[in-house]
Amino acid sequence: MQTLSLDGKIAAITGGASGIGLETARRLIAAGAIVHLLDRDRDALDSAVADLGPGAIADVVDLFDYAALQQTIDAIVARHGRIDILHANAGSYVGGKVWEGDAGRWDAMLNLNVNATFQTIRAVLPAMMRQGSGDVIVTSSIAGAIPIVAEPVYTASKHAVQAFVHTVRRQVAPHGVRVAAVLPGPVHTPLLKDWDPQRLKDEIAAGALMEPADVAEGILFMVTRRPGVIIRDLVILPHAFDV
């Protein structure tokens, strides 16, 4: 029977100081991995590392500084001799009606959800291809599979992520590298600050929101499959969420 052990594995998680990233780090560390948390918020990283213990390492980096991002990944590989898992998790959320949208907020979200995600994956692939193994898991969204009318620009960003994941997956599969996506429904994280407060209250009361830990447990399952098996897309939804 296959176990959920990650003994000796080296992982990096973007947006690792809070939410899904933090809870994923907690589970990877519990399974035996050493986890680098990549975030630009030094205080949040320090708090996360103190919470997670000695298996966590903080790396302050701005994901929009692609040279610094590459240097951070290279430093992780130099330190440990390899990198086994990348959880490209950093992202943001903007919902609402298109004609009421703010161009600056759209640009910021698209740059993080799309450009920074793509660049993070690009930065890690050469090392994984050289070693002949590795897992890249991207935090996508159910909005990447089913258009959500309340969030058209966010939906578009996650459709871009899905297209990238599955084209890159096929490019690197011959090198032993797995690229996959987790597609959660609504998760109770700070990203939902854009939601109407009454909607948030109602969804929590109805059981239509998940906790970050629910997604993190799915990611642990994905990265502990034996070589030759891939969970390409893992959709995780609150049972009461209708889409």
Predicted features along the sequence, with ranges:
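Conserved glycine-rich cofactor-binding loop
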Residues: 10, 17-18
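C-terminal helical subdomain
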Residues: 181-182, 203-243
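Residue(s) in the substrate-gating loop at a strand-loop-helix junction
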Residues: 141
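Active-site helix of classical SDR
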Residues: 121, 157
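Alpha-helical segment proximal to the catalytic Tyr-Lys
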Residues: 126, 170-171
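Substrate-binding pocket helix/loop in short-chain dehydrogenase/reductase
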Residues: 97-98, 102-110
